[in-house]
Amino acid sequence: NLDSDEVKQYLQLDKLTDAMHYVAGRLLNFKFTPVPEGSVPVFHEDVKVWEVTDKDTGENIGLWYLDPYAREGKRSGAWATSYRSHTTFDGNKNVLSANNSNFIKPAPGEPLLVSWDDATTFFHEFGHALHSLSSNVKYPTLNGGVRDYTEFQSQLLERWLSTDDVINNFLVHNKTGEPIPAELVAKIKNAATFNQGFSTTEYLASAIMDMKFHMADP
């Protein structure tokens, strides 16, 4: 059995953030540099900002905002948004992209530990942010994608969480600094495919219903 509390001890939000930046560097050649506090306007003191640049040329890609904590008046869930999309129509405008979560803010000096599911969602939403940061279009309205592509980049990023590269370099115990045990990693990967037959049936049922609705005689 997989003990979610045991897994949590190796999932620190700061380390996961570093892992996402590492993945973005490997995939897209992006470099994330923390922006000094107070140098960029933010809507809440909890929001952190990174400058995103090309690792080779130093070209500014944009800014990435992270608003990780729950607070009164903030909508629930996790999501990505863009405050400004890329465009060259009226000069080259860089991207202002953001990820938002609702984690409970830890006590000062304490790490924020998250579940495997929440870590997966964290990576998922970062995939949407990378989509925005990767855009290179003349008209800002063209920054999106076709409907069937909407969740592709986010679901693809999820898979990087369970890669050996990320696990071996960023999943360490929050108190001892020891790497996550191989036995626990095996349990996590096995759990990922548990009850997969039911999930597949759900997907097939949705597809069948979609076909029936569209083939019905109006």
Place the predicted regions along the sequence by residue:
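Cation-handling catalytic/transport regions enriched in His/Asp/Glu
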Residues: 1-218
